[in-house]
Amino acid sequence: MKVKSAVLQEMGRPTPYAKSKPIVIEELELAPPHDEEVLVKLLYAGLCHSDLSVINASRPRPTPMALGHEAVGRIQQVGKNVDNVQVGDIVSCVFVPSCGTCDSCRTGRPATCTTGSKANGAGLLLCGQSHLSRQVSKPTDPKVIHHLLGVAAFSTYSVMNKNSVVKIDPSIPPKYAAVFGCAVITGVGAVVNTAKIEFGASVAIVGLGGVGFCALLGALAAGASSIIVVDLEQSKLDLAKKLGASHAVLSTKDTSLDNLIQSIKQLTRQGRGVDYAFEMAGSGPTLKIAYGITRPGGTTVTAGLPHPETQFSISQVTITAEERTLKGSYLGSCVPTRDIPRYVQLYKEDQ
C-alpha cells in the first residue's frame, strides 16, 4: 500500500535544518504485515529528543530512515499469529520490540531485549526486514527505507511487530495517549521501576524535558515527601512548581557545578542530599549534579540519553565508603503490557 512518511535522508546535516533539509516527506510502498505483525494507522505522534539524536547523528542509524517512535494508533490489520490486539483497537507504540525469548526478556527486562536492540540498531523490524521501500530513478539510489526503533511513527500507516503495540483505553485523547509509549514509561518508570522509591522519600530531578516532567509526576504519585527540580529554563521550573515540586532551582550555563550542588544540598535535610536523584537530560554535567546531590546511602538514576562519546567520572571511594548506588534506566525498566495500562489508569485518576 502507499503511505506518506517523514524520511531522514542523511544524518548530521548542519543546522538550521530548515536550510539543510535532512527530512523529506515521501510517498513510500509499505508491505503487508507478516504473521507476527500488525498494520497500524497512526493517529498522533510526539516529537522526542531521541528523534533529534538520530537526525544530528548522536545515535547513528542507517539511512534513509522513516522517523518517529512515540505514537498512538489504530489497528487496521493483524497477522495470523497475533493474539494481543485485534482490528479497531487503539494502541500505544513501544520503541523496543521484545522477542520474549532472550535472557533479558525471560528475566523481566524487555527494555534490554538483545534481539530487539539489534533490530533497532539496524533500522529493521524484529523479523530482520524492512517493510518500507521507494521507487528510485537511479540504480545507485537507496530503495529500502529503514524503520526508526521498529515504529516509524511519522507516517500515515506503519507495520510493527505485535510486541511493539499495547492496547490502551480508547477514551484517552490520542494527543495525550501518544506519549505513553516513550516519555511516560521512561520518566515514571525510572522512579517506580528502576529506583522503586519509597513513600516519603526525598527526590531531585535534573532536567525538565518531557521525560523529566513525567518523572516528576511519577514521584508525586509514589508519595515523595519533597521534590527538587533543576533546569535551565524558568518557565519549566514554574510549571513544575504548579504541578507539585517542592523546590525549583534555576541553573545557568555559567553556574559553577560545585556551587550549584552545594546550594541544592542546602535544601535537603541536614544538607546531606536527597534519597533519590534522577538525571533526565543526557549529559555529563547533569549526571554530575545528580550524583553530587545524592546523600550517602542514596541512589542516582540516569535516564537521559547522552552522546555515545560522553564520559562521566566520579571518585570511586564515594561509591564504597558512602554506599552509593548508581543505576541506568532505559524505557523506565518497564514491562510495557504491565506498565502502560497502569499509567493510563493513573492519568484517568488525575495523577
Placement of each model-derived feature along the sequence:
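C-terminal substrate-binding/catalytic core of Rossmann-like NAD(P)-dependent dehydrogenases/reductases
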Residues: 2, 257-266, 270-271, 308-351
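Glycine-rich beta-strand-centered segment in the early N-terminal region that forms part
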Residues: 29-45, 55-106, 111, 119, ...
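Adenosine-nucleotide cofactor-binding segment
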Residues: 205-208, 220-287
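Acidic carboxylate diad motif detector
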Residues: 303-304
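NAD(P)H dinucleotide-binding glycine-rich loop of Rossmann-like/cofactor-binding domains
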Residues: 101-202, 206, 351
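Helix-to-beta-strand junctions that scaffold the AdoMet/dcAdoMet cofactor pocket
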Residues: 294-295
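N-terminal Rossmann-fold NAD(P) dinucleotide-binding loop
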Residues: 212-213
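Glycine-centered, small-residue-biased loops immediately flanking beta-strands
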Residues: 298-299, 324
